[in-house]
Amino acid sequence: TLARQYDGTTAAAGSTLSSFDALQGGETLTLSGSGTAANDNVANGISVSSLGTLALVNGTGAASNYSLNSTVINIAKRVLNSSGSKTYDANTNALAGAITLSNLVSGEALNHSGTATISSANAGSYTISNLSGISIADGSGGAASNYTLTGGTHNFTVNRRPVGVSGTRLYDATTNAVASDLSTHANLVGSETLNLSGTGTIASKDVGSNKTVSVGTLALADGTNGGLAANYTLTGGTHQLTVNQRPLNATLARQYDGTTAAAGSTLS
């Protein structure tokens, strides 16, 4: 009896020997060469319809004392691996659309659907803890009955969610974009909040709208409603600062001249 995983072929190699059924006195033999199975799909007890080059090889017993009679092969389901990723979204779902199957036979594809589960919603790398929600179906050249997800390696990564910061301040003759001026945080999940510290920079100190902020020493910190800085990143976010004109009060001074004139030249 030979045994192997499904590989899309009818190969029945001696190297896949599982057992002999009539060896005497505890003797052992091995098997070399290769024959041809009657079909290539998953099943037990498939007849090796052509012995081909299969041959008995001496073990603790002499091959010359035995002859190779009927031979069968058990073809087991091929174990699939999977991997995937998503951006942090505060849940433990790993949707089929974010998962890629691997270890398929070359030229075969499968469809898959449903939702798996990971052990934590937070950003990080995980082994998928529950695959029961994922099902596989026939695809291009691939039959689902020849494959299984059970026993494979299934990894999933939750990436940090990019967050953007924006705000306004009055002109102050600097290119600083301090955290306290960047009070709007975009792309947070649900009601989660974050805190911000440090100072970024803008390219010009002058008045203008939606100036791009370089991150500099700006840093995220844990906020409220479950907002954890470790689940977010400033990298990839859109960061903008609007610099508004600073209101000025002017004081003029002159001697009485009998008029209501308030000339700029009398600025004090």
Where do the model's predicted regions map?
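Short loop/turn motifs that initiate or flank beta-strands
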Residues: 1-268
